[in-house]
Amino acid sequence: MQSVRWEATRLMKKSTNRKRTSRIILQSLPAVPVAIVVVIYVMSLMPCSTKKMERGAALIEHKSYYELTVSGKPVAWFDALTDSCMSDNIMLSADSSVTKRSIINGCWVNKYAFMPSCHGMILTTDPDSMAYKTLATANKNIGNVIKNTAERLESAIKSLSKKDEELRYYLSVHNVNDDGYNTMAYLDGRLKQQKEQAEKALEIIRKAQTAKNAAIRLVSKYTLLHKDTAGHTVRIACNTITPASEKPFRIIQTSDKQTPDNVSPTYLHQWFTPATDAERGIIVASYPGCMLSRYDVNGAKATTFSGKATGKSRHDIPPMLAPDGAAIYTSDGRMMGISYNGRITGTGNFGLALKNLLP
């Protein structure tokens, strides 16, 4: 009888231990994902090698132009704007004469600081960001802008007409055998083309004067210039994710939302990040000299350069080597921020999960 009681007691204790163990396991389950996230986050804080920094750099072509729209439909394209007038270089299409082109830097980034989440996203800059203030003022006074532009075109047409008359007189008193005749004939043809173009532009501007819903917008287009695994430069169209504003930074994304295999996106941490106002050694990863007018994109190669953070979020690396949009790391390989106007914009400025740059 006693042995039976002992056995029953033993079984009850065993059952109790099992319940206690199960309860501990169940209580611990929520901590498992947290622990995994912590481990991944800590791993993402590991220093980068210079090779990895170089694979994180991106080379981008930026193109921009202005459009005059009526009811949201573009009717004219031009290359420059003040708060009171459009340029007189107004075309009937967005051709190369009104399009500004520049080559800029960027860096591949992950959206989240604790897991790979690039999806083709690049942090870069907008060379025209400061123009949005002028654009806003011009649109508030769109009637005066259109009126002033019409007057400017009228003046240009008068000037072209006078020059054309002078050239035609020269041609009338000379013949084809005279020195310089062919050159003058060519110039006369060019003047007539310019005059015709200005007259067509003036016609469109005058129609816009009577429209109640005319507006001007600035169009920016980004194209990734990326070397594939074979070393060939491929062009990949990108979409702009960051809403247009006077702030300089933009998130762009490859049109297919894919990240090439041979790149290394960086993490923009919000905590435990190096201070940008301290004096320390730094490394910039960039495509040096990309702002040069005849920059060879096919021969472009990402490179790292050493320098110093000089305090007050500034650095001493020349703009030729540290263009706007280039990533800056500490000398031991920790992501520090982005170069812009000779300063270091810390990763904390972009917000958790890039919230300060996303819609």
PLM regions and their residue ranges:
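Catalytic histidine site
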Residues: S49, G56-A214, G325-T330, M335-R343
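Bacterial Sec-dependent signal peptides at the C-terminal "C-region" and cleavage site
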Residues: V38-K51
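Conserved beta strand-loop-helix elements of the APE1-like EEP
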Residues: N105, N110, R250-K257
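Coiled-coil termination/hinge junctions
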Residues: Q209-G231
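A short, polar/charged loop-to-alpha-helix boundary motif
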Residues: I344-L357
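N-terminal Sec-pathway targeting helices
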Residues: T16-V34
